[in-house]
């Protein structure tokens, strides 16, 4: 599997792009006419040009059309993997240790991240996932994995900028999933697979069934269940500073000492794809009220879950340190995890959407008026870890919080037939919100041990207070004079005359280790609305030349407005050779999720807690 690491942070306010593409198209000779024309030339694309659909070889921009047979022929059932197999410019990787990226995989099209690609279902915009990939390029795009393969009639991939035609997300291109509209029949498949190493067992069950709604309607429903076990490609942890293999037999035998044994692995640092499972349902329905008027609706519901590991915290690292408790005794997280610990991250993703509308024609005018609602939510759980600042009172599992992306859109599209030209125009209104729900208190709370000497056992001059003297009288080994490990004279003797530093001065991290929870200070809802109007004209200038021009105006409540445009054309030199070219501009404003995303941890320079990291914009 290819893996592409996304490596930049959210750091832009506005993104503008000008694209120019040119390509020479050479078709097959007549000797292959029966096979090639049947399989390629007659593949029709809806995206790329308004008005009547065009074949992929006469489109002014490059479009790939994948049929249901193409999709079914791929061994994978995850839609991300299907597209990666069939579309060379589409890439998606597996990120074993990447916070939310473990559960919603970020993809690229034409080398640009997922939020630069507009995803459509039945030519309607698909809502974004709740995940903002803070570990990569800060992108936020739709979760294509929520679409079951059994629901697909065709997939169109426009590999060209189309922001002027379809909206600001279409910088890299457009992916349009057309759903099945069968009135009868159906399909059922069950797949099982495993890796040669004997792990990663996967089972997938998919099905589709079509029903007639009277004489003039259809209802097609598709469902998928998948379950994939984890793969393990790591080796037992062994580094010069700590080696698991060198530990005693008791360490290996004692289940409580195994950092990850509760999750079924004898390797303290698992490495590979995570455990995942999911149930997904999609429906598509339509009913013709007359020969010129049709009602339609489609939608989905999806639930999936997964879990993966973070990096191993070995005994003696910066997370596992001695602290001095209120009674003067010393405590270490090894009392919870004798062999160190590997945090385990769980994510539950819920996704649902509904689209409804009416389309028809009146004379030379066609219209399509629709409304849609989409929601995607991720709920996190963190286990097998601690909040170090809570000391011996820390729980070992946490609820760090939830992320929710919500969108509502109303859209009207029209086309008017001007004989050899088609005039398209329309408008849309989009309301979107992103919510960060705070985690449970223990996941972000700064406990007593986030500061040095929390129980005031020592004075500023490193002498013992009355409280310190009391715990010493009860048998504590407290030594306030042992306050530094510095050796300014470089004579092998520490400045305070004692080896090491007394645990009373230890300062530890704040929040659930591995993924601190969302605190109320950085939680909340981020909202905006926007509207857009566009016009598009296309047609045959001559028998050989097809041309297209589009203009779009978008206005955001938080990022102002912009006008973008595009021109494209296709020239047919001969039956075998054609030439196409396009030039366009694009504008993209950061999403509410990108503006509101937080990734904050508390650090302690000079012994005082300070929040650092990625904060909400504004």
Where are these regions (language model features)?
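N-terminal periplasmic accessory domains that precede
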Residues: 79-82, 86, 105-107, 142-145, ...
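Transmembrane beta-barrel wall of Gram-negative outer-membrane proteins
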Residues: 184, 197-339, 343-362, 548
């Amino acid at each position: 599997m290819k893996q592409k690491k996304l490596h930049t942070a959210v750091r832009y306010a506005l993104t503008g792009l000008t694209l120019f593409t040119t390509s020479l198209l050479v078709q097959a000779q007549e000797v292959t006419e029966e096979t090639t024309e049947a399989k390629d030339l007659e593949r029709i694309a809806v995206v790329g040009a308004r008005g009547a659909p065009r074949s992929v070889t006469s489109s002014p921009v490059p479009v790939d059309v994948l049929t249901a047979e193409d999709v079914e022929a791929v061994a994978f059932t995850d839609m991300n993997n299907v597209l990666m197999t069939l579309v060379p410019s589409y890439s998606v990787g597996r990120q074993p240790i990447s916070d939310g990226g473990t559960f919603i995989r970020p993809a690229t099209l034409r080398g640009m991240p997922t939020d630069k690609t507009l995803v459509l279902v039945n030519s309607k915009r698909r809502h974004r996932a709740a995940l903002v990939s803070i570990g990569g390029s800060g992108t936020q795009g739709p979760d294509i994995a929520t679409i079951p393969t059994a629901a697909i009639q065709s997939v169109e991939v426009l590999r060209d900028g189309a922001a002027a035609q379809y909206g600001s997300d279409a910088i890299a291109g457009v992916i349009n999933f057309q759903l099945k509209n069968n009135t009868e029949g159906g399909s059922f498949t069950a797949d099982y697979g495993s890796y040669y190493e004997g792990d990663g067992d996967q089972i997938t069950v998919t099905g589709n069934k079509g029903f007639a709604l009277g004489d003039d309607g259809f209802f097609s429903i598709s469902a998928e269940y998948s379950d994939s076990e984890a793969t393990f490609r790591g080796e037992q942890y062994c580094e010069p500073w700590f080696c698991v293999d060198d530990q005693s037999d008791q360490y290996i035998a004692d289940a409580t000492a195994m950092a990850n044994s509760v999750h079924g692995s004898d390797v303290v640092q698992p490495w590979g794809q995570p455990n995942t499972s999911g149930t997904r349902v999609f429906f598509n329905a339509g009913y013709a009220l007359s020969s010129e008027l049709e009602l339609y609706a489609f939608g989905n519901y999806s639930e999936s879950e997964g879990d993966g590991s973070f990096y191993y915290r070995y005994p003696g690292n910066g997370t596992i340190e001695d602290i001095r408790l209120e009674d003067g005794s010393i405590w270490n997280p090894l009392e919870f995890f004798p062999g160190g610990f590997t945090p385990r991250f769980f994510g539950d993703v819920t996704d649902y959407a509904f689209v409804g509308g009416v389309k028809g024609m009146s004379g030379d005018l066609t219209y399509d008026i629709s409304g849609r609602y989409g929601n995607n939510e991720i709920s996190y759980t963190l286990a097998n870890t601690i909040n170090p600042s809570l000391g011996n009172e820390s729980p070992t599992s946490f609820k760090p919080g939830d992320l929710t992306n919500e969108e509502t859109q109303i859209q009207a599209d029209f086309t008017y037939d001007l004989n050899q030209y088609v005039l398209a125009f329309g408008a849309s209104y989009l309301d979107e919100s992103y919510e960060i729900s705070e985690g449970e208190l223990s996941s972000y709370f700064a406990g007593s041990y986030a500061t040095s000497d929390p129980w005031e056992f020592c004075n500023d001059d490193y002498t013992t207070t009355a409280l310190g003297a009391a715990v010493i009288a009860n048998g504590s080994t407290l030594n306030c004079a042992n306050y530094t490990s510095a050796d300014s004279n470089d004579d092998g003797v520490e400045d305070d005359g004692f080896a090491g530093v007394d645990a009373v001065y230890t300062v530890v991290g704040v929040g659930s280790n591995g993924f601190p929870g969302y605190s109320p200070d950085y939680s909340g809802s981020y909202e905006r609305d926007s509207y857009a109007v566009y016009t598009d004209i296309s047609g045959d200038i001559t028998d050989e030349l097809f041309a297209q021009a589009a203009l779009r105006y978008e206005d955001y409540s938080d990022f102002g407005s912009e006008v973008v445009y595009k021109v494209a054309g296709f020239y047919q030199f001969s039956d075998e050779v054609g030439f196409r070219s396009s030039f366009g501009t694009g504008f993209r404003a950061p999403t509410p999720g990108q503006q509101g995303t937080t990734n904050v941890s508390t650090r302690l320079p000079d012994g005082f807690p300070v929040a650092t990291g990625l904060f909400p914009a504004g």
